[in-house]
Amino acid sequence: GLLRVNAMGGGTWITEFETIVGLDSRVFGYSGMYTHASLSPFVDRSIAFYMRQHGYRTSAFFPHGGDFYNARNAYANYGFETILDSEDMGRGAWMETDGEVAASVRTAMGPAPQAPFFSYVLFIENHSPHDCGAGDSTGFAVRFADTQEFTPNCALDEYLRRLDSTTSAVQSLQDYLADIETRTGRPFVLLVFGDHQPHTFASTGGFHYDYGAFRKVADTRM
């Protein structure tokens, strides 16, 4: 069925918790708002524990430091054996591109993993805000149909540029897994999903530009 993410522009850790543990965070009331800190210590069942019980190595990869939102402790509580953050992978405090994350994952896993594995990888390049550094609009690949104004079109172009970068990073991991399958005969599953809706083009406040005028009437009823 469909995977429905939780919010506009926030709550990454909620989606992480729900996809790993399989529980709706809302059943825990206010504690469900900060799952890594408030709920993770009580987890004793998850997909990571399940995969370990069936002979899989489990690992998690962060594009940021492990202290961010208590991520390292939380993922240990969720059952992951190996947890590598940006500093563990030699990338400093923060990885700027998803390509960096994908390359670091391939390096850490190695060209020929000896056992089946389950890895949870976080990308962050396409997170808002989508301010861009372009000086003019001549290089924009796409524009809004209803306005030639620079600010919204610049953000749209930046959003799509980063999306293309993310697509390339995902493809590199797919190629990596396909190569392992060719050499070992072990098939793979690659699941890609977003953690929440982009805040940049919403009308939920927090941005100096209101994109509400570009939304369809049907969209406003959702």
Feature names for model-found ranges:
Residues 1-222:
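Solvent-exposed soluble domains appended to multi-pass membrane proteins
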